[in-house]
Amino acid sequence: MDLKNFDISAGETGVELTILDLDNKPTDIKIKVLSFHGKKGREVFMNAVKENKGAEQSTLEVMVGLTVGWSGISENGKELKFSPDEAKRIYETYPLIANQVERFAENARNFLKK
């Protein structure tokens, strides 16, 4: 088997995730996420572990650290610009979005180089 089948280098710059609604249909929300398995992902994870804030807070910090941008997110008719603080607030407020980001970042297949 060719080792290129294990190349998840796309996770170092980020891959776009389309958020699904409650009916599993794609929305306009796109979140650019780094791979949990990449160099930056491991670095973000180790920093969260060192801070020892507890499992839930550490998971939140990792997700925020792996999120590098987005589009299509609005709240009360106002477009939200990406920032780590805003990502943290969204993930705390909207767990359905947070869960999709967490699952996506953990799945190495999402970051295979095409």
Please give the residue ranges for each predicted region.
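Exposed, low-complexity/repetitive linear segments and helix-based recognition motifs
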Residues: 4, 18-20, 58
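Short, surface-exposed, charged amphipathic helix/loop patches that serve as local interaction elements
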Residues: 23-114
